[in-house]
Amino acid sequence: MESSSSLLNVVNHGKKPTSRPRSESADAKDRFSFSFLDRFDKFERDYFHIPMQALAKSIPGMCTLMTTFGATCTGEGLVSFFGLLCWTISVNACIHGIWLVPVVEVLNGLIKWQFGRPRPGWNDPRVDVLSTSHEYSFPSSHAMLSWSLATFFAYYWYDNVGTGQTPTSIPIYYAFYCHAAAVSISRVFDGAHYPKDIIIGGFLGRQIGYAHYHITLPYFKAYAKLNSTQPMMQIMSGNLISVAMLVVTLICYTIAKRRWGKAPKKWCLLACVKQDNLQPHFVPLFDYVGMCGVFSGLSVAEVVMNSTRPGLLLPTSWLDSLLRIVVGLLVLIGMWFAVRAIEKGMATNTVTRLLLRFIRYAQVPPIILLVAPACFEAIGI
């Protein structure tokens, strides 16, 4: 997940970079030797980013549209989506698909640390950075996550709803793939990724979504059924996996930090992050630890939850659906920012901050599956 506010990216997409030169600096020292991959990166910038961004600027509203597509696959967009899905459409679809988010995000981050490739705008001042991030470029987490979710929900829709033909006789579930494609392409328009980043990211996401639906999900359903009388066993198993994810993340962080070192000054100046303080290892570490927290929270909440409770049954009217979304998001946002305030204002060392980040993300599944439904029942919606 990108290490910046997607909402700010949408708001600020039209602002031109401040005092950025329009040609590549000849005397800037690159981090890597000018290898084949570097030449290929330049080819992509010359023949994809520059023309595509020029095209977007020539069409009113296109920059905003592209940035908005990208925002639908960030933290804020995904939390809202899964909350809406759980509270108003299908609890089962939510609890089966949401596991992809922490798994894909952590896996993607570890791959990025392995390759350590800079984003297009970090190396080339001609590329406008419309979506800032501290993460490396390859592969695209937006593409990987959107294609994994699209694949999962397309299969889920087909098996549980049917083809659902549109007036043009096109199956509705193709809309999931169209959205994933739009999210992926938007990352090139935003100057956040190379075409190869979204192609490889989309390919990996497609395979992960397929494997999750056809292999992982049936296995864990069978495991849960076998241990249905031992909820603590299920909770412990899930949290052991979460701990393993944390350990692997910390090991990969240490390796990446030693291998790649500090970000070059050129990257820091062009990345458009706050105070030019680009940190492609330290800042993303907090996001990946948070995703391990999501996995841990899911391991507890899905075992404890009761899908037949009134607060998780389908609402009876559009008004109830709307009220559920408003109340649920207010509860979620309130608790999210309460922990965030402690993390930002009171935590004084890295370990404490990482622990609070883990807790902040871990509380999201219990709020969606346990706390919000209790609030719905209390107010009769």
Where are these regions (language model features)?
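Hydrophobic alpha-helical bundle signature of multipass membrane enzymes
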Residues: 2-192, 207-210, 214-219, 223, ...
